[in-house]
UniProtKB/Swiss-Prot annotation:
InterPro entries per UniProt: UPF0352, YejL_sf
Protein name per the record: UPF0352 protein HAPS_0210
Protein family membership: Belongs to the UPF0352 family.
Pfam families: DUF1414
Organism of this sequence: Glaesserella parasuis serovar 5 (strain SH0165) (Haemophilus parasuis)
Length: 74
């Protein structure tokens, strides 16, 4: 999703692969997969970012990056 990252491609790909394997293991349809991933994002923000304002900023940045990645995937 990100065009620039401080993480190596191998790290991102390994984590992404683990997430995909887990969703496939549970035979999660698209709507359930999105719901679970959305809940995971919420949990990550709530448990790791104390400021509600900063959570909102990060959520907006994530949403924008997601929309941009969908545009470039066409």
């Amino acid at each position: 999703m990100a065009t620039k990252s401080k993480y190596q491609d191998k790290q991102i790909e390994a984590l992404l692969n683990d997430l995909i394997v887990t969703l496939e293991k549970h035979k999660a349809p698209v709507d359930l997969s999105l719901m679970a991933l959305g809940n995971m994002i919420t949990n990550i923000l709530v448990t790791n970012v104390q400021s509600p304002q900063q959570r909102e900023v990060l959520a907006e940045a994530f949403s924008s990056a997601l929309k941009n990645s969908l545009k470039s995937a066409k």
